[in-house]
């Protein structure tokens, strides 16, 4: 019988003491047991896409446009829109297009939590305790991307939130959060060779990779830097328990959206 003890070591298998085999098997276990979404993931993807389209100022959407944006079927889009409508988040226009209403702080938190639950989470630790800082690893990622590596990976979390909202009241990022849009995880060791995938939810992760179902179109490229969407960043902050900071950020987003709608500069 193969087990993993409290220290994260393999026990009860003749090859468990082999470093390479042990590392491979632990990676497999961590990947397969990481946080995953529930069965309604496609509907939530539609809802998240609608929110992100609104944040990017793309205006009212047809069902067909939503289908194309998130790659979902018509019944899935219809079900998601129906649920969002019942929650009071959507306004239906006379031409059958739909638009997202103003979202309260409570609505933002509800949507972002559901979005976060719709992702697979892979956590990486540094057994040496000498990992690079999150900011240094983010810069390393940007350099790798300039060389064609990890093109569908973007920086989220605290660093990403500060990109969209520089007034975020956090001194330093506790970890590097990355949104993975269909990319593998081999690139992580290029950020810091000592990083190892863990299945222990209590372990202090220095890098957290969120495998998202959000369309890559929402990745923001800015002066050689690659940032996850606003909604991804907000979901990351909630995952870290930074609710007050989330409220500050969504207040800023709502303020900007209101001024943009009125044609004014915030």
Description of each model-found segment:
Residues 1-27, 114-266:
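Long, low-complexity, charge-rich intrinsically disordered regions
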Residues 19-49:
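Short alpha-helical segments that sit at the start of domains
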Residues 39-43, 95-116:
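Short, cationic-aromatic polyanion-contact patches
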Residues 42-46, 62, 76-80:
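Internal, well-ordered alpha-helical segments in soluble enzyme and binding-protein domains
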Residues 50-54:
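Short helix-to-turn junction characteristic of helix-turn-helix DNA-binding domains
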Residues 56-70:
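Short acidic, hydrophobic short linear motifs in intrinsically disordered regions
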Residues 71-86:
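Short amphipathic alpha-helical interaction segments
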Residues 85-96:
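A short, conserved structural fragment
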């Amino acid at each position: 019988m193969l087990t993993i003890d409290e220290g994260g070591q393999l026990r009860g298998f003749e090859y468990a003491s082999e470093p390479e085999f042990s590392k491979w098997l632990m990676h497999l276990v961590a990947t397969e047991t990481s946080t995953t979404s529930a069965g309604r993931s496609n509907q939530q993807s539609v809802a998240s896409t609608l929110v992100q389209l609104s944040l990017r100022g793309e205006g009212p959407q047809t069902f067909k446009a939503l289908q194309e944006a998130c790659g979902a079927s018509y019944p899935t889009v219809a079900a998601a829109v129906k649920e969002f409508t019942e929650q009071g988040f959507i306004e239906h226009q006379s031409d059958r297009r739909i638009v997202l209403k103003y979202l309260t702080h409570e609505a933002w938190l509800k949507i972002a939590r559901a979005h976060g639950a719709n992702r697979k989470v892979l956590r990486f630790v540094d057994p040496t305790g000498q990992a690079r800082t999150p900011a240094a690893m983010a810069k390393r990622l940007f350099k790798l991307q300039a060389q064609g590596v990890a093109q569908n990976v973007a920086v989220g979390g605290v660093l990403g939130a500060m990109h969209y909202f520089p007034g975020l009241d956090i001194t330093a990022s506790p970890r590097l959060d990355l949104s993975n849009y269909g990319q593998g995880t081999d690139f992580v060791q290029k950020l810091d060779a000592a990083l190892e995938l863990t299945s222990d939810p209590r372990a202090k992760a220095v890098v957290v990779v969120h495998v998202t179902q959000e369309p890559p179109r929402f990745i923001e490229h800015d002066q050689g830097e690659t940032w996850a969407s606003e909604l991804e960043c907000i979901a990351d902050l909630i995952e870290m328990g930074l609710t007050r900071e989330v409220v500050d950020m969504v207040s800023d987003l709502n303020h900007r959206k209101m001024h943009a709608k009125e044609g004014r500069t915030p």
